[in-house]
A protein has these predicted regions:
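Glycan-recognition and catalytic cores of secretory/periplasmic carbohydrate-active enzymes
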Residues: 1-392
Length: 392
């Protein structure tokens, strides 16, 4: 690596940390944290003005993780740690239904609004509790995280507990990949055989069933044995999801001393996803593709959302660290420069979430039920650490 490349990485690391500490965390501490009821609001306008007091249960967990991770990785700020605990307390007090399944949205005070057929609320609650346990040394919260993980697994394996989304039998990408991350975060604070088993099982399923060699992609849903479901939904490629999966697997490969098989899987998925996802005309990672080249059914198919760009920045750094191949450093620079040219709000802080294909802002709000303090701060923390580590 040249001195110029090392300098570039150090400058990126400094920028990411500075943005986290001076912009993103203060934005959400000021505009999102609910100091009356606990937890966090995410439905805020461009300048942070609260638009809707409905609370995303996903984001109670996501913010619980983010604030504790920022404390662990960047700065021992007690206010961040208190904010993490507030979100976790809000989840435990208000967000779990009588059957043990968490809600999707609740009111400001915590009354139920909506419940969905997934266990993503649980997944984010689990990583919040684990990260808080890491910050505080709390054995209690490490065990709570494991109990939430076990509850997720029970719900997923109990026939009829989670109403199926479709009558089509098959396997989904989302839950398979997210369980890698959940188990990996929990492994840092508690030793339980089922966590390693989950990571291995998810990666095996991705390799065996979801990776499609013919179309060179990971598909969002496949048949029970990995068959292509030849419908619009079955042909859907979500490049951002694929890149996120790639770096989850590369992170695990790294934890295992750059395990050769896992490294190969992660790099392959990243390379495929970049080929499908990067928009050669306008730049940025596009939302959806169809593996047969038909127009994707989703109306946001050609938009540029904030989170795939975040995943591309992290993913390219993991690939570069794994290989030393300069092409990945060049891809990181492309993803970084595009994101900072189009998504970063240099006037009012934080990032826009939704852009048209050409990179122009589709709507300026900084948050809603799906966007809040998670993908951007996670990228800033992780990319800062990776860039600094690689540049040594």
């Amino acid at each position: 690596m040249t001195n110029e490349q090392k300098q570039y990485l150090r400058e990126c690391a400094d920028l990411y940390r500075k943005e986290l500490v001076e912009d993103v965390m203060p934005f959400w501490m000021k505009n999102g944290v609910d100091r009356k009821n606990g937890g966090i609001y995410t439905c805020v306008d461009r300048d942070g003005t609260l638009m809707d007091t409905t609370k995303s249960v996903w984001f109670q967990g996501r913010w619980g993780w983010t604030a504790a991770a920022a404390y662990n990785l960047v700065e021992k700020n007690e206010e961040w740690l208190q904010a993490s605990k507030s979100a976790i307390d809000f989840i435990e007090k208000h967000c779990v239904d009588a059957d043990g399944h968490m809600f999707f949205t609740v009111t400001a005070e915590g009354a139920p609004v909506q419940k969905r057929r997934y266990v993503f609320s649980e997944s984010f609650a689990a990583i919040a509790m684990a990260e808080y346990a890491k910050a505080t040394g709390s054995v209690e919260y490490a065990h709570k995280a494991l109990e939430v993980f076990r509850a997720m697994k029970r719900m997923l394996s109990t026939p009829g507990f989670l109403e199926p989304k479709t009558t089509v039998q098959g396997r989904g990408h989302s839950i398979t990949m997210i369980l890698i991350n959940v188990a990996a975060v929990l492994k840092e604070v508690i030793d339980a055989p089922e966590l390693d088993e989950q990571i291995d099982s998810s990666i095996n399923d991705i390799e065996r069933y979801l990776m499609n060699e013919e179309y060179k992609t990971v598909l969002e849903m496949v048949g029970p044995e990995g068959e292509l479901i030849d419908t619009c939904a079955g042909r859907t490629i979500n490049p951002g999801h694929c890149i996120e999966t790639a770096w989850f697997i590369l992170a695990e490969a790294k934890r295992r001393g750059w395990d050769e098989r896992l490294t190969r899987i992660g790099l392959t998925i990243f390379d495929w996803a970049w080929e499908w996802g990067w928009d050669n005309e306008y730049g940025g990672i596009i939302n959806f593709r169809d593996c047969k080249g038909f127009p994707p059914q989703d109306y946001s198919q050609d938009m540029k959302f904030w989170w795939p760009q975040c995943e591309a920045i992290i993913g390219a750094l993991y690939c570069y660290e794994a290989t030393g191949d300069e092409k990945y450093l060049a891809l990181h620079r492309k993803a970084h420069e595009w994101a900072y040219a189009h998504l970063k709000d240099h006037e009012m802080g934080e990032w826009y979430g939704y852009l048209h294909r050409d990179g122009s802002v589709a709507q300026p709000a900084k948050g809603n039920i799906f966007k809040g303090p998670f993908h951007v701060p996670r990228m800033l923390m992780m990319a800062a650490g990776l860039a600094e580590e690689i540049a040594k």
